[in-house]
């Protein structure tokens, strides 16, 4: 590793953010104590943590660094004529009321049901301008890596750790290794960040990033919008990574400017000057590297029961016989048995029962626009739910007439929430049904007991909706 002109060693962005937040250094016997800039909470993983605080008589260490919303268990259907929300059960209603009480008692800013800013936590946080470059961000949710799109070190934590951050604003953490994923070239027509991340996970495998933070680099990544970068970082965990991030640039700053929690005036100028120093230094080294060519990719879709089991929509369902490793062969056989798919058969043409467009992976305005491109002037042939990721997304989409396009196509336009991604709120599929979903996980039963999930981009999902089967969105857009 060559030294910089000032004599210092080149550092990655992960090094820079980590070093700036170490309260106590890591030793062989103990993890580092890491300061946390932003703690996002929602109604499902936080109640137990607040209960522990009450039992121990503790207050929040930095309530202004904590921001709350509701998303997992809330209904995506509107209030009834009686003004009540149609919760799926009493437990869901109790989670919401408990969240309201916890935030009121501990002084946490909450944007709950009926609030104009409410949304899926990883859509809502960035929209508020709360997520900023160089921050450490945590949330009791697996897909917290979404916020890495801003050049933040963001990762999910467990319920006990939620309590630790509420009480101390710190966490015990071991320094992660680094993995550079460089994407050359540019994505072709009909492809998006979702296709890119599915291709990356298929290449790495679901454990390929274990113990690492992924930094996404290269011209194809730089060309992505902030929405695309959030999709990319969101699914880093599905490759086993602790987090994923993209260094901030003018695209980042333009997206953040003017948002409620973003710095203003002179403070904004000072912040941008700091943020410009965050990208990895020339000559910085990574523990591992992976390189892909974006121009060689095709629209992707999963066929199995983990996000790493992905192929091009033009491809064939893999044959386990081709697997030399016995364990990998058994895993593939089990996945195909659950999914009911035939080895060697084209995935295109596979009948689809339900389509879900939404989630913290693909519930942003850009995703709504992509889906509308395919739905406009066409009719869906299967049940289709389009669920905006936040009230802001919903409002913006409706201002553009996207809701009308969705409804005229025969699809359902819903209220914001996690919805069918995790199927906690009554939005689910039935046993044996196939769902093309823009969410992030295709585990057995993820969208309902016995349900079969195929992960894809909004374009590919919308193409499945209007054809009733897995289809190449490029052909649908071309009218073929």
From Swiss-Prot:
Top-level taxon in the UniProt lineage: Bacteria
Binding residue positions for [4Fe-4S] cluster: 360, 418, 421
Cofactor: [4Fe-4S] cluster
CDD domains: IPMI
Keywords attached to this entry: 4Fe-4S, Amino-acid biosynthesis, Branched-chain amino acid biosynthesis, Iron, Iron-sulfur, Leucine biosynthesis, Lyase, Metal-binding
Molecular function as annotated in GO: 3-isopropylmalate dehydratase activity; 4 iron, 4 sulfur cluster binding; metal ion binding
Pfam families in alphabetical order: Aconitase
PROSITE patterns in alphabetical order: ACONITASE_1, ACONITASE_2
E.C. no: 4.2.1.33
Pathway note: Amino-acid biosynthesis; L-leucine biosynthesis; L-leucine from 3-methyl-2-oxobutanoate: step 2/4
Catalytic activity, reaction form: (2R,3S)-3-isopropylmalate = (2S)-2-isopropylmalate
Cofactor note: Binds 1 [4Fe-4S] cluster per subunit.
Coiled coil: none
GO biological process: L-leucine biosynthetic process
UniProt cross-references to NCBIfam families, sorted A to Z: leuC, PRK05478.1, PRK12466.1
Assembly notes: Heterodimer of LeuC and LeuD.
Protein family per UniProt: Belongs to the aconitase/IPM isomerase family. LeuC type 1 subfamily.
Record's function text: Catalyzes the isomerization between 2-isopropylmalate and 3-isopropylmalate, via the formation of 2-isopropylmaleate.
Name this protein carries in UniProt: 3-isopropylmalate dehydratase large subunit
Provenance organism: Anaeromyxobacter sp. (strain K)
Lineage: Bacteria, Pseudomonadati, Myxococcota, Myxococcia, Myxococcales
